[in-house]
Amino acid sequence: MASPLTRFLSLNLLLLGESIILGSGEAKPQAPELRIFPKKMDAELGQKVDLVCEVLGSVSQGCSWLFQNSSSKLPQPTFVVYMASSHNKITWDEKLNSSKLFSAMRDTNNKYVLTLNKFSKENEGYYFCSVISNSVMYFSSVVPVLQKVNSTTTKPVLRTPSPVHPTGTSQPQRPEDCRPRGSVKGTGLDFACDIYIWAPLAGICVALLLSLIITLICYHRSRKRVCKCPRPLVRQEGKPRPSEKIV
């Protein structure tokens, strides 16, 4: 027969093996999933805004809402409210004066609603929720709640297309183009029409004057000097003699 010590050790080993088998067969607790909506909110001043955090999975405790002001330079978020999952206990942050800016409620066992009573610059920023399950803290995605920017768009001005005339036909001139102004009394064409007439004429006159000056300069330089004095004839002996006149 086995001794009492041997039987005690065998029993402990058997119990230890069963506990290991049972522990390995148990499934690990599933991490909760946080869904928050809407994903983004563009609100107007004074508007009421509802933010919903839906918790999928088992949560031992409640849900907390946190807030990061858009104008704040501090990186850490601010606690807003805590809602318990088992009873209707709601805890606000007294420093933030959350009870006047916000209101909260637990819609169902897994939906926690945070309401912005009146949207203002004081509660403009980024919101997210958080839960604790099995001593682990989980966070949702961030929802930006910002002021809506009203973009002013100007209507495009529609211009009537000008009629297209066939090729080779003269376009009739509108009477208001060369009509004298009502407040100015004068004779002849208007200044707007005078400049279109005299400017080309003045340009042509200047071009002709420059051409004439250039022509005179070139002609003066190209003239050759002709010597009319007779040259003396050279004799074969090397002495010059007077040139003979040709009749």
From Swiss-Prot:
<dbReference type="GO" id="GO:0002456">
    <property type="term" value="P:T cell mediated immunity"/>
</dbReference>
<feature type="signal peptide">
    <location>
        <begin position="1"/>
        <end position="27"/>
    </location>
</feature>
<keyword id="KW-0391">Immunity</keyword>
<keyword id="KW-0325">Glycoprotein</keyword>
<dbReference type="InterPro" id="IPR015468">
    <property type="entry name" value="CD8_asu"/>
</dbReference>
<keyword id="KW-1003">Cell membrane</keyword>
<comment type="subunit">
    <text>Forms disulfide-linked heterodimers with CD8B at the cell surface. Also forms homodimers in several cell types including NK-cells or peripheral blood T-lymphocytes. Interacts with the MHC class I HLA-A/B2M dimer. Interacts with LCK in a zinc-dependent manner.</text>
</comment>
<keyword id="KW-1133">Transmembrane helix</keyword>
<keyword id="KW-0812">Transmembrane</keyword>
<keyword id="KW-1015">Disulfide bond</keyword>
<keyword id="KW-0449">Lipoprotein</keyword>
<feature type="glycosylation site" description="N-linked (GlcNAc...) asparagine">
    <location>
        <position position="69"/>
    </location>
</feature>
<dbReference type="GO" id="GO:0045065">
    <property type="term" value="P:cytotoxic T cell differentiation"/>
</dbReference>
<dbReference type="GO" id="GO:0051607">
    <property type="term" value="P:defense response to virus"/>
</dbReference>
<feature type="transmembrane region" description="Helical">
    <location>
        <begin position="197"/>
        <end position="217"/>
    </location>
</feature>
<dbReference type="InterPro" id="IPR013106">
    <property type="entry name" value="Ig_V-set"/>
</dbReference>
<dbReference type="GO" id="GO:0042802">
    <property type="term" value="F:identical protein binding"/>
</dbReference>
<dbReference type="InterPro" id="IPR036179">
    <property type="entry name" value="Ig-like_dom_sf"/>
</dbReference>
<dbReference type="GO" id="GO:0050852">
    <property type="term" value="P:T cell receptor signaling pathway"/>
</dbReference>
<dbReference type="InterPro" id="IPR007110">
    <property type="entry name" value="Ig-like_dom"/>
</dbReference>
<dbReference type="GO" id="GO:0019722">
    <property type="term" value="P:calcium-mediated signaling"/>
</dbReference>
<feature type="topological domain" description="Cytoplasmic">
    <location>
        <begin position="218"/>
        <end position="247"/>
    </location>
</feature>
<dbReference type="GO" id="GO:0009897">
    <property type="term" value="C:external side of plasma membrane"/>
</dbReference>
<dbReference type="GO" id="GO:0042110">
    <property type="term" value="P:T cell activation"/>
</dbReference>
<dbReference type="GO" id="GO:0002250">
    <property type="term" value="P:adaptive immune response"/>
</dbReference>
<dbReference type="GO" id="GO:0005886">
    <property type="term" value="C:plasma membrane"/>
</dbReference>
<comment type="function">
    <text>Integral membrane glycoprotein that plays an essential role in the immune response and serves multiple functions in responses against both external and internal offenses. In T-cells, functions primarily as a coreceptor for MHC class I molecule:peptide complex. The antigens presented by class I peptides are derived from cytosolic proteins while class II derived from extracellular proteins. Interacts simultaneously with the T-cell receptor (TCR) and the MHC class I proteins presented by antigen presenting cells (APCs). In turn, recruits the Src kinase LCK to the vicinity of the TCR-CD3 complex.</text>
</comment>
<feature type="disulfide bond">
    <location>
        <begin position="53"/>
        <end position="129"/>
    </location>
</feature>
<feature type="domain" description="Ig-like V-type">
    <location>
        <begin position="28"/>
        <end position="139"/>
    </location>
</feature>
<dbReference type="InterPro" id="IPR013783">
    <property type="entry name" value="Ig-like_fold"/>
</dbReference>
<dbReference type="InterPro" id="IPR003599">
    <property type="entry name" value="Ig_sub"/>
</dbReference>
<dbReference type="Pfam" id="PF07686">
    <property type="entry name" value="V-set"/>
</dbReference>
<dbReference type="GO" id="GO:0050850">
    <property type="term" value="P:positive regulation of calcium-mediated signaling"/>
</dbReference>
<feature type="glycosylation site" description="N-linked (GlcNAc...) asparagine">
    <location>
        <position position="97"/>
    </location>
</feature>
<keyword id="KW-0564">Palmitate</keyword>
<keyword id="KW-0393">Immunoglobulin domain</keyword>
<feature type="topological domain" description="Extracellular">
    <location>
        <begin position="28"/>
        <end position="196"/>
    </location>
</feature>
<dbReference type="GO" id="GO:0043235">
    <property type="term" value="C:receptor complex"/>
</dbReference>
<dbReference type="GO" id="GO:0007166">
    <property type="term" value="P:cell surface receptor signaling pathway"/>
</dbReference>
<feature type="region of interest" description="Disordered">
    <location>
        <begin position="156"/>
        <end position="182"/>
    </location>
</feature>
<protein>
    <recommendedName>
        <fullName>T-cell surface glycoprotein CD8 alpha chain</fullName>
    </recommendedName>
</protein>
<dbReference type="GO" id="GO:0009986">
    <property type="term" value="C:cell surface"/>
</dbReference>
